[in-house]
């Protein structure tokens, strides 16, 4: 499936057991980026995410992660410069295979892992383990809410690992690797897109060397959440408060 707007290509890859995963190839001025899946389905239960609706089936093997890159390069004729583990699944819930994949990617493709981003919804114990490996990757944390009450209402993982624990793990990651954290924040209309949310986020991230990536939430047919129309307004509130 190819976008008429920006040459983005979405692939649906069939696996040997009949399961399927999605991969997205994106073209930017600085090169080509690919977003790959790490699991078939997902256990995490984030209420705004389509990947979790059908439940969890299995982890992907390292070879199945590499396949998404190789086949997308072959089909598109484009050289991939940046890899993002942010497709279907929670990468750190499949951490052993993800680390094997990263080592294979670095060894076989001579790709610097500094051009790889790994996403997590907040598996705190795995963040510490990943930090100690010092792979040089960017850690992208799906935050989406600045308080425990709000985050727990949309992300069940927050009942297991509270925001305070997550922040400590992120600080450890930065201090251990020197790589700043990227926080993903999907703005949901009437949920997390107001001044109160922005002020709480500024307070939460104060003093951190980090980046905040604001995106309007993807509306899904199974969900009730709507895209916020206040992305630029919210962004300006963060900039005025000293975040970027």
Stretches found by the model and what they are:
Residues 17, 27-29, 40, 89, ...:
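Short, flexible active-site-adjacent loop segments at beta-strand->alpha-helix junctions, enriched
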Residues 3, 37-38, 51, 119, ...:
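Short linear Ser/Thr-Pro motifs
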Residues 53-82:
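Conserved alpha-helical substructure of the radical SAM core
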């Amino acid at each position: 499936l190819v976008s008429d707007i920006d040459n983005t290509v979405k692939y649906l890859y069939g696996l040997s057991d009949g399961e399927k995963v999605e991969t997205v190839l994106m073209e930017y001025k600085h090169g080509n980026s690919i977003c790959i899946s790490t699991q078939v389905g997902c256990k995490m239960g984030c209420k705004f995410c389509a990947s979790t609706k059908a439940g969890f089936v299995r982890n992907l093997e390292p070879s199945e992660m590499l396949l998404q890159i190789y086949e997308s390069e072959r089909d598109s004729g484009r050289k991939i410069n940046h890899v993002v583990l942010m497709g279907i699944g929670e990468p750190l819930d499949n951490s052993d295979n993800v680390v094997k994949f990263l080592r294979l990617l670095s060894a076989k493709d001579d790709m610097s892992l500094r051009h790889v981003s790994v996403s997590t919804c907040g598996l705190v114990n795995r963040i510490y383990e990943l930090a100690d490996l010092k792979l040089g990757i960017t850690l992208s944390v799906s935050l989406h809410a600045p308080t425990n009450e709000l985050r727990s209402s949309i992300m069940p993982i927050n009942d297991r690992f509270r925001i305070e624990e997550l922040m400590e793990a992120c600080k450890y990651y930065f201090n251990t690797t020197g790589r700043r954290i990227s926080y993903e924040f999907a703005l949901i209309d009437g949920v997390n897109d107001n001044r109160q949310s922005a002020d709480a986020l500024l307070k939460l991230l104060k003093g951190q060397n980090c980046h905040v990536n604001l995106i309007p939430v993807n509306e899904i047919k199974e969900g009730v959440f709507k895209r916020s129309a206040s992305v630029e307004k919210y962004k300006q509130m963060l900039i005025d408060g000293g975040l970027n």
